[in-house]
Curated annotation (Swiss-Prot):
Keywords: Cytoplasm, Nucleus. GO terms for cellular component: cytosol; nucleus. It is found in: Cytoplasm; Nucleus. This is Uncharacterized protein C630.07c. The keyword Cytoplasm applies. Its main location: cytoplasm.
Amino acid sequence: MDQYRDLPKEDPDTAIEYESGVDEESSLKIEKFRVLIFGKDNSQDDLVKSVFNLSKLSEKEKMPFGIKCESEENPNFESYHSKVGKKSCKRFMRWLKANAFAEERDIDCIWYQLNLLDISDEDILCLQYLQGCLIPIVSIIYDFNEFLSPFTKSFLSKIGESNTITVKGMPLADVLVFRKKVLKLVSQLSFMTDRKELVYTTCLALEDDDAYTNFVSAQQEDSSCKFYGGILIGVSHCKYAAAGASYPLPIPASGLLAQKLAIGLLCKDIIKLWNLCPESSILTKEILLELPKASDVAKSIGKMILTSMFVPLWLLKGIWEAPATAKIIIGSIADVTLPVQRMYYFIKAGGKLDVPTIHAFYQHYKEFVRPKCLEHIAEITTFNVVTAFSSEAVYQEAIRLLDRFRYVSKSSEEDLIVPSFVVNDLITYD
């Protein structure tokens, strides 16, 4: 790998374009995601270890309502563990009120563990009580298969209709419908048949953008969550990029300036979400410096956003600039997401990132993946002045495109392969 160390940077202007993002280290740091779990001790620990990819969870501090835990393996989360019950809920609410202006009051989400076979009135009251703290709640439902087993037995044995089976004097079907309706009134539901469902449900429950980003970054259960979350965050910046096409700004090339701002923001946000190098700001900066410039993306797609210099009318600006801007945003999302996703699998398989390795992955992307990807955007992706301003339309098109070119992990051995190349007049790859 020593052959990479003396390689010249691809373009010094790249560093200038992302200079503001590189210097602001604080903007690249991810805040901790704080989750409170009501449930049984063993199941709480197993749940946290699975979602955040831990082998060991350490008790950090005793709290009035339970304990606070963290792990050196994943410094991007804190979990608070409490037993299910009215007393614990009241103690938590008192603590929350007493620490209303403290940083540690910022609990992002509550996971409430429930056994579907034994949900009590007190459980429902506790959930309703917790609603008052205005923190998103996810009810994690266990023993769903056991709950449905009487239906299956009844059907197979042909004894009779399944709703003749009773639980605590009520028909089983009525119990299921009633409990589901009540729980949905106070929380999001996640059935623990698959841990990835909990990740997905938590994402739905989190309305705060920062909390969503922090959770997606901290969780390690579902890489697809990071992939699609990054696209969603990237598309959310399309409104900034389209600002130059929306209004007749008096600044020359206003569309291009707005694009640069949006692309700089989305690149930093997506890198934060994947959180590849939490211990090294140098490597994070290196990833930023490897990213192509906004103007290069525009040239590759064949749409230069300079009409604001010549066409001052907002309508014509919108007709020409908005569709091209949407394509450029998708191209920029691809430029950061596709190679970063590949490096994520490399790290998960046991690989260690350094500057030459990052450079190798990006060179491989630029040589083999990027030309086909941008050609696909330019020729196949279609937008008009209406759909280009629709975040949903841009998101769906970005999903379609990036799904086509994303790296698919097949084995840890394959994930550990680093693309190699030789520096000559022509760059060749293995």
